[in-house]
Amino acid sequence: MKDVQNEKDPRMVPLKKVGIKDLHWPLKVILKEDGYQSTVAQISCSVDLHREKRGIHMSRFIEVLNKLEVITPQIFEEILDDLIEIMEAKRAHLEIHFPYFIWKESPVSRKKSPLKVDCFVEAEKEKNFSFKIGVRTPVHTLCPCSKEISDYGAHNQRAFVEITVKTRKFIWFEDLVEIAEKNASSPLYTLLKRPDEKFVTEKAYENPRFVEDVARDVALELEKDPRITWYRVYVESMESIHNHNAFACVEKGDFVLEG
């Protein structure tokens, strides 16, 4: 059977990335407490294409991905190595996004409910292996300016803290979620009874935060974590009294700690 993809391309233009995206795939995530959580990931993967080759065999991505069942750094490097070999490439890239549920107790009534966070993993292999993990955690922020100038209350809203890290040691998704929540005005909960609502509302009022505050405090905590070699923090607030959102962003190398 004729192999069209392997035909020599006369244009001689190399391509940096060729691949597939938005592939939905079942997989398991290791829980910090113990066991696994099943989820459905959205996957994108690619390789570079030599200037003399017309195309790649897309089906080979799926064949290689068949070994992806549980998320570990080791399996990602294996997949990238396999892609480089089977595609005769120099570089391979793999990115997955998936929902992850953390069971939380409400602060007063102790009612349990799941909180959805969005997790992602990005891996790349050329000469060296690069591996990033991250979470996008929903939190609660209350505006310090609004509190200061108002006789009653202050505007507050849901916000999202996105943390991306490179690490020298394994780090749990739950650890990153905890860092995001502790530096906001208040965590979010799926289930709140009236005493819980009172607690969360008052906690946020006593702990006002701009997106700038959240981004800086999260960055300082990541900066001091010996497991983390690089990080990026992005905070976005779904402003309740404005027709726009507010955001702040910082990554390792943007500042130097003094003292």
Curated annotation (Swiss-Prot):
Annotated pathway: Cofactor biosynthesis; 7,8-dihydroneopterin triphosphate biosynthesis; 7,8-dihydroneopterin triphosphate from GTP: step 1/1
Broadest EC class assigned to this enzyme: hydrolase
Domain of life: Bacteria
Site entry: May be catalytically important: 143
Known EC number: 3.5.4.16
Swiss-Prot/TrEMBL keywords: Hydrolase
Intrachain S-S bonds: none
GO molecular function, one term: GTP cyclohydrolase activity
Transmembrane segments: none
Function (record text): Converts GTP to 7,8-dihydroneopterin triphosphate.
Family: Belongs to the GTP cyclohydrolase IV family.
Protein name per the record: GTP cyclohydrolase FolE2
Organism of origin: Thermotoga maritima (strain ATCC 43589 / DSM 3109 / JCM 10099 / NBRC 100826 / MSB8)
